[in-house]
């Protein structure tokens, strides 16, 4: 397996699972966490390593260290492994997904932004979903026909129990306290704004070529997806909130190893599902428009990354993230995109506009 994003939450969990099944790791890539990368190198002995910045190269305990995006693409080309787990955060992961598709590799995709911004250019790629909701949908949809509607669930994020009027005052520390999941900073903020759920709906549309998709809040994160059939029947996928299950579905050839303790239905508290309030989560207003106009993905994602970065750096408030997105959409409208190069152009233009 080739693992990009090895020091993040998904990468660390993937390596625990790889150790469980003795899956050889041929390549590791990370951003700046060189100390953890060196521990991973010592344990998994990859043939190739990549880091973001050449200034850290001398710190890496390996004799084949590649640098930046060029280095990632070199690894994909040179390494014969058929499986890439792409756990790079954000738009930065897109070029690796495109290269892996070009090379015919199986892509265990944790980088949902690839599909959000460029789904129409990734048709035909061999994707294995790593998000828990999409792994759940894959399980529910296998061999099924006559589907009326799909649902994925949201926990509500760090501010589910907050009143709308209190969201003006929330701090970064508050926003990073996810009630159910242990994740990286960016996705934890995206969960709090509901941008993550918006992106997951578009991801599901591209993965399963189906537009009747919605999301509901299920605060305990025990139900991950539901499938409604035309005859009125519905199925649901239950599991505890732990990313290892979805990762194992993507990287293991057989799903015969105990990964989590099953949900004990006899002890399970009452489940409640709630619609997502677009007053509290204004970004979610974009769901239907986005499904109608998937080209909006590059604008929404770039603006969201700028807004989240500013919030993480204490340069703006929590509510400014949504304002950032709507400001960019007002300016650019629906982009006409006919090539992958235009995706990169619109990403650049959106960031430049919001920084000016």
From Swiss-Prot:
UniProt similarity note = Belongs to the DXR family.
The protein, known as: 1-deoxy-D-xylulose 5-phosphate reductoisomerase
- The residues forming a coiled coil are none
* GO molecular function annotations of the record: 1-deoxy-D-xylulose-5-phosphate reductoisomerase activity; manganese ion binding; NADPH binding
Query: Where on this chain does 1-deoxy-D-xylulose 5-phosphate bind?
Result: 112, 132-133, 155, 178, 191, 196-197, 200
User: Which enzyme class, named as a word?
Assistant: oxidoreductase
Q: Does the keyword Metal-binding apply?
A: yes
Q: What does this protein do?
A: Catalyzes the NADPH-dependent rearrangement and reduction of 1-deoxy-D-xylulose-5-phosphate (DXP) to 2-C-methyl-D-erythritol 4-phosphate (MEP).
Q: Biological process GO annotation list?
A: isopentenyl diphosphate biosynthetic process, methylerythritol 4-phosphate pathway involved in terpenoid biosynthetic process
Q: Which gene encodes it?
A: dxr
What residues bind Mn(2+), as annotated? 131, 133, 200
UniProt entry keywords in alphabetical sequence: Isoprene biosynthesis, Manganese, Metal-binding, NADP, Oxidoreductase
In short, the EC number is: 1.1.1.267
């Amino acid at each position: 397996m080739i693992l990009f994003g090895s020091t993040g939450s998904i990468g660390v969990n993937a390596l625990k699972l790889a150790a469980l099944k003795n899956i050889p790791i041929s390549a590791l890539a990370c951003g700046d966490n060189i100390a953890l990368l060196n521990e991973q190198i010592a344990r998994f002995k990859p043939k190739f390593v990549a880091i973001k910045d050449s200034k850290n190269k001398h710190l890496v305990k390996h004799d084949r260290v590649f640098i930046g995006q060029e280095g990632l693409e070199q690894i994909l080309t040179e390494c014969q492994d058929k499986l890439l787990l792409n756990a790079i955060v954000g738009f930065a992961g897109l070029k690796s997904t495109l290269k892996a598709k070009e090379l015919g590799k199986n892509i265990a995709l944790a980088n949902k932004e690839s599909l959000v911004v460029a789904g129409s250019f990734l048709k035909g790629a061999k994707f294995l979903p790593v998000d828990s909701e999409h792994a759940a949908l894959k399980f529910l949809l296998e061999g099924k026909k006559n589907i009326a509607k799909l649902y994925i669930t949201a926990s509500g994020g760090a501010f589910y129990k907050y009143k709308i009027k209190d969201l003006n005052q929330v701090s970064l520390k508050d926003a990073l306290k996810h009630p159910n999941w242990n994740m990286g900073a960016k996705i934890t903020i995206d969960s709090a704004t509901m941008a993550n759920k918006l992106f997951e709906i578009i991801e599901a549309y591209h993965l399963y070529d189906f537009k009747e998709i919605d999301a509901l809040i299920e605060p305990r994160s025990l139900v991950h997806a539901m499938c409604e059939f035309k005859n009125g029947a519905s199925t649901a996928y239950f599991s505890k909130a732990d990313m290892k299950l979805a990762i194992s579905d993507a990287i293991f050839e057989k799903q015969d190893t105990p990964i989590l303790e099953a949900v004990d239905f006899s002890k399970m508290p009452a489940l409640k599902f709630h619609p997502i309030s677009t007053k509290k989560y204004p970004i979610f207003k974009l769901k239907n428009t986005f499904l109608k106009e998937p080209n909006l993905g590059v604008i929404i994602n770039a603006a969201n990354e700028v807004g989240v970065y500013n919030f993480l750096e204490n340069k703006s408030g929590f509510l400014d993230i949504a304002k950032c997105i709507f400001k960019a959409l007002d300016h650019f409208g629906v982009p006409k995109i006919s090539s992958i190069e235009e995706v990169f152009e619109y990403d650049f233009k959106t960031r430049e506009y919001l920084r000016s």
